[in-house]
Amino acid sequence: MKLLSLHVQDFRNLAAVELAPSPRATVLLGENGQGKTNLLEAIYFLTTLKPLRAVRLAELVRFGAADAAVAGDFEGPGGVRRVAVQVAAGGRTASLDGKALGSGARLDDYFEGLASVCFSPDDLLLVKAGPDGRRRFLDRAAFNRWPAVLGEAREYVRALRARNAALRSGTAEVEASFREPLVRAGARLLVRRRDLVAELAPRLRAAFAEISGPAAPEADLAYRAAGGVEVGHPEAEVAARLARALETRLERDREKGFTSAGPHMDDLVLALGGKGARLYGSQGQQRALVLALKIAEIENLRAALGRPPLLLLDDVSSELDPAKNRFLLGYLAALPAQAFLTTTDRRLIEPAAGPDTAFYEVRSGVVSPLVS
C-alpha cells in the first residue's frame, strides 16, 4: 500500500503540512530540532495509532492548539482509502473513509494493508540497552505482523494492573479472581512473540551473514520467558505453565506488590556464535546485528503481506559506519518499497536516491519541496 498524500495539522511543531510523497523515496532534509522526526512520527501514528516515542497523547498537540490531526490517502489492491486520526483533550479518534472507528468502521478494516517499520538511532542501542526496549521492539513487530496484537496487549496490561493492585491491597480471593484473565492474555501474548521470533531468526541469520561476511560468527535470536516458563508448547500448555509460575511466586509477589512472571518481564536474546551479543559483541557487531534484525522484520512482513511495509528511517545513516550505510542504502535502493528518510546531510543518503526521489526541506516545522 502506497501513501499518496499526507495532511498534518498542529502535530508536535508542525502547524500545517501537505505532502505529496514519492512512491519510492522521500527525503526530509534539515538541521536537528526542525521537525523531521515529527513528520515521521505523524506517519507512524497514522499507521499504528501509537506515538513513535513514549509520551502522553496530549504532548502530540502543538503548543497553543486545541487538537492535532493527521490524514492520509493510501492506495492498495482495493483502491484508495483515506485514514485519519485526531488527538484532542478527550483522547484519540480515528476514521476510515470518513467513518469513525466503532461507529461505522472496524479497527481491523482500518489496519488492513497498513504496516510501517521505523528505524531510528535509538534502535542501534537495542542489543546493549535494557530489556524494555527489546520488548517494545517485539510488540511493535508483532503488531505489524498481526494487528490483533494491539487489543491483546491492551487486555494483558489491564489484567496485569488489576492483579498488581490486588496483590497490594486485596485478599487472596481477589488476587485469584484476577489471575485467570492475566494467564489467558499472557499466554496469548507469549505465543505471538514466540511465533514472531521463530519467523525472524532465520532471516536475521541470513541478513547478518550478508552484512558481516562469511567469517563472522553466526547470529541467532531467542525468546527468554521469565519465571522459567517454557514457551515451546501449544497455547493451552503455555497458559498452564504461566499459571504454575504465578502460583509458585505468589508469596514473593505479595510481598513486593508486583507480578514477577509474564510477558512484561521477558526478554529477547540476540547472540553471536552462541554467546550473548550484549556482553560479548563489539559495538560494530551489535550495530550490524540490529541492522540485520530490522531487515529481518522488513523481509518477514514482505513475505507475509506480499509486499514490503512502509519504511521510516530517522537519520540512521549518520550513526552507521560507511560500510554498513552502503549496505543499508543498497538494500533500500533494490527494495520495491515506499520509504521516508530524514537526514541533516544529503550526501549520506544519495546512493539510495533515484530519479523519482522527492526531496523536502524541514525548517521550524515548515515543510517545503526542493528541486532534486
UniProtKB/Swiss-Prot annotation:
Pfam families: SMC_N
GO biological process: DNA replication; DNA synthesis involved in DNA repair; double-strand break repair; SOS response
Recorded superkingdom: Bacteria
PROSITE patterns: RECF_2
GO molecular function, one term: single-stranded DNA binding
Amino-acid positions noted as binding ATP in the UniProt annotation, renumbered to this chain: G30, E31, N32, G33, Q34, G35, K36, T37
Keywords assigned: ATP-binding, Cytoplasm, DNA damage, DNA repair, DNA replication, DNA-binding, Nucleotide-binding, SOS response
GO cellular component terms attached to this protein's record: cytoplasm
UniProt-annotated location(s): Cytoplasm
Gene3D superfamilies, A to Z: P-loop containing nucleotide triphosphate hydrolases, RecF/RecN/SMC, N-terminal domain
HAMAP family the UniProt entry points to: RecF
Protein family (similarity comment): Belongs to the RecF family.
Free-text function comment from the UniProt entry: The RecF protein is involved in DNA metabolism; it is required for DNA replication and normal SOS inducibility. RecF binds preferentially to single-stranded, linear DNA. It also seems to bind ATP.
Name of the featured protein: DNA replication and repair protein RecF
UniProt source species: Anaeromyxobacter dehalogenans (strain 2CP-C)
Lineage: Bacteria, Pseudomonadati, Myxococcota, Myxococcia, Myxococcales
